[in-house]
Structures are given as C-alpha cells and as structure tokens.
C-alpha cells in the first residue's frame, strides 16, 4: 500500500498513474511515499 497527500492506493502503480509519475523510479514527488 502506498500513501499520498489526498489518500491511499492499494497498489504503487495506481498512485503513480494518478499522480502522473515516472514508474521507472521508486518516487512520485514530495507528496508520495511507499
């Protein structure tokens, strides 16, 4: 499970897709953590 500023996702891919992040890296910006 990953968490971000507006809530949580069951999958890391979902968070990255929602925030439009680069899936090749394990980060999604300051508002995203694993």
From Swiss-Prot:
Xref: Pfam families: Toxin_12
Tissue: Expressed by the venom gland.
Disulfide bonds: 2-16, 9-21, 15-28
Primary localization: secreted
Subcellular location field: Secreted
Function as written in the Swiss-Prot or TrEMBL entry: Ion channel impairing toxin that inhibits voltage-gated sodium channels. The recombinantly expressed toxin shows a weak activity against Nav1.7/SCN9A (25% inhibition at 10 uM), and shifts the voltage dependence of channel activation to more depolarized potentials.
Family per similarity comment: Belongs to the neurotoxin 10 (Hwtx-1) family. 54 (ProTx-1) subfamily.
Species assigned in the record: Phormingochilus everetti (Malaysian purple earth tiger tarantula)
GO MF annotations, alphabetized: ion channel inhibitor activity; sodium channel regulator activity; toxin activity
Domain comment quoted from the record: The presence of a 'disulfide through disulfide knot' structurally defines this protein as a knottin.
Record's protein name: Beta/mu-theraphotoxin-Pe1a
GO cellular component terms, semicolon-separated: extracellular region
Keywords (A to Z) from UniProt: Disulfide bond, Ion channel impairing toxin, Knottin, Neurotoxin, Secreted, Toxin, Voltage-gated sodium channel impairing toxin
């Amino acid at each position: 499970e990953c968490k971000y500023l507006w809530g949580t996702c069951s999958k890391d891919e979902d968070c990255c897709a929602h925030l439009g992040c680069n899936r090749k890296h394990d980060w999604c910006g300051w508002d995203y953590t694993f």
